[in-house]
């Protein structure tokens, strides 16, 4: 299995993975702009040119505290590849990358419905932070 960061030519395969994992459509132009920058990266695992697992990483540096955080979104594994340890492998790779880049924290949000994913996060040492998520549609 090949580990890589998402490139423009990988976008169609990534869109299929996100559709499979979350039943949502990717905004291709926004995704393309995001991966061209330096703040957002998508770590992907490929088998035969198909992305079978991935995580979107947004790096944030708090200018007041000087702390670097890797914030994870769309941790996903293609349904036919689930149960093979890829979710754990994704998290291990992110933690290793965060350590290598001197990050202070790795953070993510997860739906209560995603029981398998939440188990992985707890098993990998993540804790629930005492925070409420506020949201306002504009």
Feature map (PLM): residue ranges:
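Hydrophobic adenine-recognition pocket in adenosine-nucleotide-binding enzymes
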Residues: 75-77, 110
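Conserved active-site alpha-helix within GNAT-family acetyltransferase domains
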Residues: 88, 112-130, 135-136
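Short coil/turn motifs at secondary-structure junctions
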Residues: 60-62, 80, 113-115
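Conserved GNAT acetyl-CoA-binding A-motif
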Residues: 91, 98-110
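Conserved acetyl-CoA-binding loop-helix of GNAT-fold acetyltransferases
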Residues: 77, 83-96, 119, 123
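Acetyl-CoA-dependent GNAT
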Residues: 5-67, 73
């Amino acid at each position: 299995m090949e580990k890589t960061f998402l490139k423009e030519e990988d976008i169609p395969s990534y869109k299929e993975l996100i559709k499979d994992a979350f039943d949502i459509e990717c905004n291709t132009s926004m995704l393309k702009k995001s991966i061209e920058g330096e703040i957002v990266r998508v770590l992907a695992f490929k088998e035969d040119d198909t992305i079978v697992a991935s995580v979107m990483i947004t790096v944030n540096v708090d200018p007041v505290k000087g702390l670097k955080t890797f914030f994870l979104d769309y941790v996903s594994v293609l349904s036919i590849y689930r149960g093979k340890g890829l979710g754990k492998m994704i998290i291990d790779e992110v933690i290793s990358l965060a350590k290598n880049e001197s990050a202070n924290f790795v953070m993510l949000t997860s739906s209560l419905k995603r029981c398998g994913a939440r188990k992985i996060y707890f098993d990998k040492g993540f804790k629930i932070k005492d925070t409420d998520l506020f949201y306002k549609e504009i």
